[in-house]
A protein has these predicted regions:
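Conserved acyl-CoA
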Residues: 84-96
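Structural preference for long, well-ordered alpha-helical segments within the folded cores
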Residues: 88, 109-110
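C-terminal "cap" of GNAT-fold acetyltransferases
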Residues: 6-7, 97, 101-105, 114, ...
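Short glycine-rich hinge loops at helix-strand junctions in the catalytic core
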Residues: 80, 115
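Acetyl-CoA-dependent GNAT
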Residues: 4-77, 83-87
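Conserved short alpha-helix immediately C-terminal to the canonical SAM/SAH-binding motif I
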Residues: 85, 104-107
Length: 136
C-alpha cells in the first residue's frame, strides 16, 4: 500500500535513508515535521503490517517535481515497490525529474522502465562525481 508518511514513520525512514548514496536527512526531517513549512512530500510503501518498507521524497518545483530520494528496504527489492512509489508520485505531478549516478545501473534501469528519458549529464553533481538527469 502507498500512503503519505506520518511523523511516527520517522525512525524507520531514517533507517531506510542509510541505504542511499547521498541522503538528505534535513530535507526528510523537514518534510515529516508538521510544524515546519516544507513543500516536500514523502510517500511511503508499507508491508501488510503498515510498516514502511520504502519511501519516495518529492519536492515540487517550477513545472516539475523532483524525486529527491527513492529507497526500498533491501529485503523488499524486486517486488515492484519502487515502481509503485513512482507511479503514485506521477499521479500527483505532470512532470518528474530525478538525478542518478552514472554507475547506478539498477536505478537507471528502473527509471527507463518507468518512462524516464535521459535529459543531460551533470558533472560534479554528487560529492563523489557526476549525475544523469532523467525526465518523465
Amino acid at each position: 500500500m502507498i500512503r503519505h508518511a506520518r511523523p511516527t514513520d520517522a525512525p524507520t525512514l531514517a533507517r531506510l535513508q542509510t541505504y542511499l548514496r547521498e541522503p538528505s536527512p534535513g530535507l526528510l526531517d523537514a518534510a515529516l515535521d508538521a510544524d515546519a513549512y516544507s513543500p516536500a512530500t514523502v510517500l511511503v510503501a508499507t508491508a501488510d503490517d503498515d510498516r514502511p518498507v520504502g519511501y519516495l521524497l518529492a519536492v515540487p518545483g517550477d513545472g516539475t517535481t523532483y524525486v529527491a530520494e527513492l529507497v526500498v528496504d533491501p529485503d523488499h527489492r524486486r517486488e515492484g515497490i519502487a515502481t509503485a512509489l513512482l507511479s503514485a508520485c506521477a499521479a500527483r505531478s505532470e512532470r518528474l525529474t530525478v538525478t542518478v549516478a552514472p554507475d547506478d545501473e539498477a536505478a537507471r534501469s528502473l527509471y527507463r522502465r518507468c518512462g524516464f528519458e535521459e535529459a543531460r549529464r551533470l558533472p560534479d553533481f554528487f560529492a563523489d562525481g557526476a549525475a544523469i538527469l532523467y525526465r518523465r
